[in-house]
Amino acid sequence: PEPFKQVYYYYPHGKNASRNYTQSNADKDDMDRQFIEKNACRYFYNFESCRDKLQYLFANEPDPTGTIDSIISYLMDYGHPFGPSVTTWEEFFKALNSVTIPGSTTLQGTNIQLASWKKFARIMRKFQSEDLFVDKGHEITDKSDLALDLFDNMTPNDVKVIDIAQLDPFMQGFVFGDVIQQVVERMSAKDKNTPDKIVIFVDELNKYASTDVPKSSPILRHLLDVAERGRALGIILFSVEQFRSAIHERVKGNCANSAYGRT
């Protein structure tokens, strides 16, 4: 056996210079070598690349009335004051603040209740200082659209490693949701540049497809799609979790192979 030869690493953008401006606990010498050999880059999310992905931050947030979903749709439709001129995170949060003022004309124009906007804003503000949400990277080679870059120049036997280990659990889910959506979309509409098969390795699948995950979760929806149509699409999901019983029944029911053991 020998190491894979065609491996490319994606490290989450960070502010720590001693860690190559990443949020990673990978070996520093390994990272240095990978960057020098151009086998690695940092990834980040500017607002423009993130507008249609915010739903993944709310994947585990119960939304029985669909209010959060309505707000996200409003943002994706460039509703006022989140029009095309809002292109940075600073502009987004400024616009968000304007709709959380009771009685404001901006709020009234959205036709969405103040309480719903406040709930959405409260959750979004937790990520206002997130190092992954920046308008530009540390270097010009940093990637602002991870999911799209994964498919650029993809060749057979490529291995793409996306480091999310040190990220907040919400951010881990966000990145995973972004990637799994792109994989499903690409494999559902194959062209000559699309690989025949893609194998996805993910640890702790129970974070995204457990019996406790809200039914409205977009990540769960993608995973159920993979579990039920993966063979036809050419997507193979390989996952590890501590308790199989905690995994969604439709995921377990479509599992082709299982391995059990103790640690």
Which stretches of residues belong to each language-model region?
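P-loop NTPase motor domains
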Residues: 1-225, 232
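Conserved ATP-driven motor cores of ASCE-family P-loop NTPases powering translocation/secretion/packaging/pilus
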Residues: 218-263
